[in-house]
Structure formats: structure tokens, C-alpha cells
Design a protein with these regions (language model features):
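C-terminal segment of N-terminal export signals and the immediately downstream linker at the start
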Residues: 27-58, 66
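Structured C-terminal cap/extension of enzyme domains
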Residues: 20-24, 44, 213-311
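N-terminal secretory signal peptides and thylakoid transit peptides that target proteins
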Residues: 1-23
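Alpha-helix-loop-beta-strand connector modules within alpha/beta enzyme cores
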Residues: 102-117
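Glycine-rich, proline-tolerant flexible connector loops at the mouths of alpha/beta enzymes
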Residues: 89-105
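Active-site mouth loops of central-metabolism enzymes
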Residues: 59-70, 119-125, 251
């Protein structure tokens, strides 16, 4: 079972300062907030366990282990942990990549400091069970923090299996994921009849379909919400290429387009953790520091929505 995050405040301050200097953020106002309070955290409703509000969506960087080795993902995870982050969201790929990721999880500086999630994406009960057991073996973990059904795949078959994993102590939490607006109705129906610990859904400044109903509904049901696609898998940056960040974004400490979307999400009270996918430790650090800085109020969020509608 994953241990609680144990970095001391003194260690956090020291690591934050070194990392910030490396990426040109020394003296940034968010650093003082981070040093005093750490990354903001929110509770998992079913247990009260706290999670930092920024996590790593690691499907791409883990999928590159067989070609690029383990050091790229290890470096991103070191940056995550150094700033108080802990959630890493994964998706089984193949034996070579997953076994390599297991070696990363066993590194002394990372062992016991990560909240590791995985997914089942197979059709059929036996295939799902085998995928879960393979993940346990490759990751070197008898207990996985969170097991999710990817995109509601074969939901009625796999959900009883996940409930068994949790009852047996092989999974601490269980849930489901979606990443497309077309799946939101099915997710809502699932939430009306079942009580997962977690759901994962797409949400950003440019994908706001869940904002008015599904996101607050999940929170009202006592379900932790993990946000994916904060940058629309890169399409967000393509849309804004060549556009200047409005000067008024500086009123809430926003300096980049990445921060523009992240700060919009972070100001929403109904989510638990937002996944940022990167293979660059400096970008991981910037994302974590964004969470420690000022956030837009509702009037500013409305202005953000109006601006995005024009580009």
C-alpha cells in the first residue's frame, strides 16, 4: 500500500528553490505560497485521504519507455514528488513498457511517495482480470491505489471485478473514466446506480460540457473527480498559436496559455485532481507552481470564457 507523502517542509522549500532556479522561476510569487503551504490538496470523499490538485497523466511518457528508457519518466516523477505532487495516472501498454515503469516506481526517491492509478480496457471478464494481474506484476505492487474502467469499456462485466479487487484489498479505490462529451450521459447513468470512489472526465476552458451539471453532480454524489484533457491533448495550444495572452490574465498571476486553462480548472470547487501530461520536468514544475498561485474569481472566469469564444 502506498505510504503517505513524507517530504518535510524544509525539504520541499529546498527542492522548490533549486527547481525554480533551474527553470527561471526563482523569485516567483507562487514560490512563497508553495514553501509555506505546499501544493493545495483536496479530499477523496469516500475516505478523507488528501490528494494534491495537480497530477501527471503518464500514458505517453510510459509508452515511450521501451524506446527511450526509464530516465525521462523518472525525471518527471522526481519533479512531481519534489513539489508535493503524488498522483500518476497510467494505462497498461505492453510488458516492456510496464515492467520498465515498475522499475521506476521502485526507485528509492519515489518508492512509497506516489498514488498510482491504472485502467482496464479489455473486453471480457477473464481478459480484464488478466490485465489487472499483469499490471500488479509489472508494477511490483500487490495493492494498486486506483483501478479504473477505461472509457466505460465492457462496464457491466468489469465493475463487479473492480468491486472484488477492492473487497480483497488489491485496490484501494475503484472508478471509471471518460474522455469524450459523447460519453457523459452514460457516465451520469452509471453514477445514478453505482457508487465509485473516482470518476475521470474531460474538462477545460475549451471543453466545458461537464461544468454545469455532471461535475457538480459527481461531487454531490461523494465521488472524487479527476480531470483529463486540460489542454485537449495539445489541440488547445494549436488553437491559440500566435495569439497573445490578454494583459488582464496577469491579475490572477497567469503568464502562459497553459496556466490560463489550468487556472480556470483549478478555480472550480468540484474536482479533486487535474492531470497534466508532459515528458518535460520543467513543465511539470510549472504546472505544480500554477496551483500554488492566485486563481481567477467567478467574474474573471466569465471573462476567460468570453475571450476563448473569440479565438
Amino acid at each position: 500500500m502506498t505510504s503517505p507523502f513524507t517530504t518535510t517542509r524544509r525539504e520541499l522549500i529546498a527542492r522548490t528553490g533549486m527547481a525554480a532556479a533551474a527553470i527561471g522561476l526563482a523569485g516567483h510569487p507562487a514560490l512563497s505560497v508553495l514553501a509555506q503551504h505546499g501544493i493545495p490538496q483536496r479530499p477523496i470523499p469516500s475516505s478523507g485521504e488528501m490528494l494534491p490538485v495537480i497530477g501527471l497523466g503518464a500514458s505517453k511518457v510510459v509508452a515511450q519507455i521501451a524506446d527511450n528508457g526509464t530516465e525521462p519518466v523518472a525525471n518527471v516523477l522526481r519533479a512531481l514528488v519534489a513539489h508535493g505532487g503524488k498522483l500518476i495516472d497510467t494505462w497498461p501498454r505492453n510488458a516492456a513498457n510496464d515492467a520498465g515503469f515498475g522499475r521506476v516506481l521502485s526507485l528509492p526517491e519515489l518508492e512509497g511517495k506516489l498514488f498510482v492509478t491504472t485502467k482496464i480496457d479489455q473486453v471480457g471478464k477473464d481478459a480484464g482480470l488478466q490485465q489487472f494481474r499483469d499490471t500488479q506484476r509489472h508494477y511490483g505492487r500487490d495493492v494498486l491505489d486506483l483501478v479504473q474502467i477505461f472509457s466505460l469499456t465492457d462496464l457491466d462485466t468489469h465493475w463487479p471485478s473492480l468491486q472484488s479487487f477492492k473487497a480483497e484489498g488489491a485496490a484501494r479505490y475503484i472508478g471509471v473514466t471518460v474522455a469524450q462529451d459523447s460519453q457523459h450521459d452514460d457516465l451520469e447513468q452509471f453514477l445514478r446506480r453505482e457508487q465509485p470512489d473516482f470518476v475521470q472526465m474531460n474538462y477545460s476552458i475549451t471543453e466545458r460540457a461537464v461544468e454545469e451539471r455532471l461535475l457538480p453532480f459527481a461531487a454531490d454524489r461523494g465521488v472524487a473527480v479527476v480531470i483529463n484533457r486540460p489542454f485537449m491533448n495539445g489541440a488547445y495550444f494549436d488553437r491559440l498559436e500566435g495569439k497573445e495572452l490578454p494583459a488582464w490574465a496577469g491579475d490572477f498571476g497567469c503568464e502562459t496559455w497553459a496556466q490560463f486553462s489550468l487556472k480556470y480548472i483549478l478555480a472550480n470547487p468540484h474536482f479533486t485532481c487535474v492531470l497534466t501530461e508532459t515528458s518535460n520536468p520543467a513543465h511539470m514544475e510549472e504546472n505544480l507552481l500554477t496551483a500554488a498561485g492566485p486563481l481567477p474569481n467567478e467574474a474573471q472566469r466569465r471573462r476567460m470564457r468570453e475571450f476563448i469564444a473569440t479565438v
